[in-house]
Amino acid sequence: VLKGASSVLYGSSALNGLIHVKTKRPGLDPVTQVNVQGGLYGKPRQDGTPLYGGLDLSHSRRIKNFDLTVGANTFLDDGYRQDNYNRRVRVGGNLTYHDPRVQGLNYGVNVNYLYNDYTGFFIWRSPEEPYIQSPLANMGRRENTFYIDPFLNYTNSEKGTTHRFKGRFFHRGSRIITHTTDKSLFDITNNMGFDISSVPEIINMAQNWQTELLPTFLPYLPEVMNGKVSGLMGELGKLGNHFFPTATSADYMDLISWVMGRTPLPDKNNVGAWLVDAMKPMEKKAPEATDHTYSYNLDYQFSKKFEHSQLTVGGTYERIHADSKVTGQHSSDNVATFLQYDHKFIDRLNVSVGVRLEYYRVDDFYREAETKIFGAKVPVKPVFRGGLNYELGEYSFIRASFGQGYRYPSVTEKFILKDIGGVGAFPNAELKAEQGYNAELGFKQGYKFGNLKGFVDVAGFYTRYKDMIEFRFGLFNNKTFDYIDGLSKLFNAFSSGDGLGIGAQFTNVGRAEIYGVDLSTSGVYEFNRDTRLAYTLGYVYTNPIDMDVDSRNAEEEANDDLMAMRSKSNDSKYLKYRQKHSVKGVFDLEWKQFNIGTNMSWKSKTLAVDYFMVDERTKAEPNLMDYMRSMLFGNLHDYWAENNKGYFVMDMRVGMKVTKNIHVQGLVNNLLNKRYSARPMDVGAPRTFILQVGANF
């Protein structure tokens, strides 16, 4: 675990730290591990009891000069929410050959395959049915991912040098799975209180709207032009109640989803024929075309150890090619070279400095970044980083780091239509690179009082961004992927036949700064040789600031378009989907072969969310967006106001070593069965019961 942005060896985008995972070499004796788990949700959605479970298998051994590791994993989760499932199978392995002819030389290959069939959950049906997905959220995904990583390592211990070569070929085939509501028109309209004898009246209104509807709604046009829509919406409500007297907003969404599944819509002359044809059973839709993503990667690293220092240089190249039936073919190239120098002074001070040069292009745009060097513009971005660690005394350390970051938008973010939580994840070809820097100052102190020992760590951090990348949720043109932020774009999507989609898109939000404090302590108390208590406590304070909030609020306030979108749910200075305070605690008590433990966490309220979901501003009367939200999400405004007040979640576990090699553990997640949400319409899992059995032999 590397905190802060002090290293250039792991890419230019890791500003807040990273975790480098290394595979353990097999021991002299073969080892097989089997872990089985199964669980059920205590009080989930009402249609049955969804289960989940998984199986992990791994085997490692040495065969003469070969290291062999193979593994398999399967996971099935019905989901505690309707149409929110995950079915995953993974197999992989590692083969390493230690060449006996050359000391310090090893080479081999890692191979991995993943099948993943899943749907997310982003929009609920209503606050009264929070575990049932909206019929508008009808997208899932089926993926097949394969990669093969050849590698070669050579270490000359006499010269203190190491060469590392790594390569990767990666392929992912990804297909959007589209679902439509399985409710019949009869079931939908029956729930809405519809009388079948009203069909001729509806057909007459559709065919003669100039005389049947226009006289009712036209008088409200002056009010609408002045931004007042309550009168018009009142008349629309009366019309809806006339035909659907018992309908809820969720029922209207069922009806809209049913109609959207039977496009193209009729014109005024064939409403009756379209309705008769629409009543017939739908033919099963053909699967969406498969999108393919290919990646080729080559990385080289050379390091030289000196008496008190180490020099590391290297380079990396990655090419990504994406082939989508919707958005076409796109490719990117990323070339980087880096240098890092680490030095240890007077046995107490460790210093690390480095520089990384990045070149990135997408398609034929060869200058995603430009930097002036001696007056000339070159298409590379330099990233400088450095850090130090000083031992103040016994078990007492102070550290500091500073690093620049630069994250290029991926081909997927710019050009590929995907999905998130059952709704569209729309590409944004205008997305720019995010850049910034991070500074951190930390202090770590070990302690020992009798049988208690551990450490306490406190750090302050500051991060500054330019063109920060965040996602926004809203309406989009289904063909051009334009964000709908005005009536003209809305009408254009309808008139052109492009249609509307609901979902999210990555976008640049401007300047931002995030600063705060991270305080934690971990330790263990030994009661006796059979009993010990291990613990971890942590608190994080974060202040996420939108530095352009004043100018953005003024610009949005001046926009009087009825469909004008705002950047977030309130006028505060805070970034979206962040909490200021979070506290966690982990305790594990072991006694002989038994153990009992708990995880506890508390988070404060979410500071701001997307405007398309909630508007927390006070106003004299509802605007058009308020009515639209009520139709799409039910009374989400009041639900969020009542429930966005921070939450506490507690998990418990009890385990036992049955034998030296077999361990059984029972867990209860969300022990208090707390209903909580970190964002609107995302209700956390209810109380969950899990049984795990692990065996090593």
Explain the meaning of each model-derived region.
Residues 38-42, 63-65, 74-78, 111-117, ...:
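Transmembrane beta-strands of outer-membrane beta-barrel pores
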Residues 77-88, 98, 102-159, 163, ...:
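Flexible loop and strand-edge segments within Gram-negative outer membrane beta-barrel domains
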Residues 164-168, 172-178, 391, 397-401, ...:
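Membrane-embedded beta-barrel scaffold of Gram-negative outer-membrane proteins
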Residues 1-2, 14-36, 55-57:
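N-terminal periplasmic accessory domains that precede
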Residues 35, 346-347, 460-464, 483-612:
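Gram-negative outer-membrane beta-barrel transporters
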Residues 58-60, 73-74, 96-99, 107-114, ...:
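Conserved C-terminal beta-signal and adjacent last beta-strands/turns
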Residues 58-94, 118-125, 174-179, 305-320, ...:
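Surface-exposed extracellular loop regions of Gram-negative outer-membrane beta-barrel proteins
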Residues 308-316, 320, 328-464:
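Structural signature of Gram-negative outer-membrane beta-barrels, strongest in the C-terminal barrel
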